[in-house]
């Protein structure tokens, strides 16, 4: 076998390996917040919206999307509730792990990233935001594959007023 043949063999193996790696897209859904601004004993991700907990809508969106699996990050006191009353009850089969969050959002993201080891691409979503769409998810996956990182934003629709502290 000549050098040219050997080079082609190595290159084709790399392409096959890379194609396998690209399949792994993990969604980390953060649901460890306390929702203190809501002035409620129930964190907003667990409040009922329509017939379901707010968190359900985010999990269902990722369940129905091209992501391969979901890591759910929640508070230590809510792990069993999430497992039994949301994931199992509503058959959210892509949830591979439920991990506890940290004191701050970045701690929860860190714990989710540790649990998502092996994922080539990671989407991070706040479980208290139920209006995520399939288009946003697929556009995010497409963008991260091109640019290595991306973020989602929507145009501001409400009036914004600047208030002078002294008035």
Residue ranges with predicted function:
Residues 23-79:
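N-terminal glycine-rich phosphate-binding loop and ensuing alpha1 helix
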Residues 12-22:
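Intrinsic disorder/low-complexity segments
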Residues 1-14:
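Extended acidic/charged loop-beta regions that coordinate divalent cations
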Residues 3-5, 132-167:
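Conserved core of the sugar-phosphate nucleotidyltransferase
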Residues 38, 62, 82-86, 140, ...:
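Hydrophobic packing residues within well-ordered alpha-helices of enzyme cores
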Residues 121-123:
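Short aromatic/hydrophobic "clamp" motif used to bind/position activated sugar donors
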Residues 11, 29, 55, 112, ...:
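Residue-level signal for inorganic ion chemistry
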Residues 56-119:
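Conserved N-terminal catalytic core of the sugar/cofactor nucleotidyltransferase
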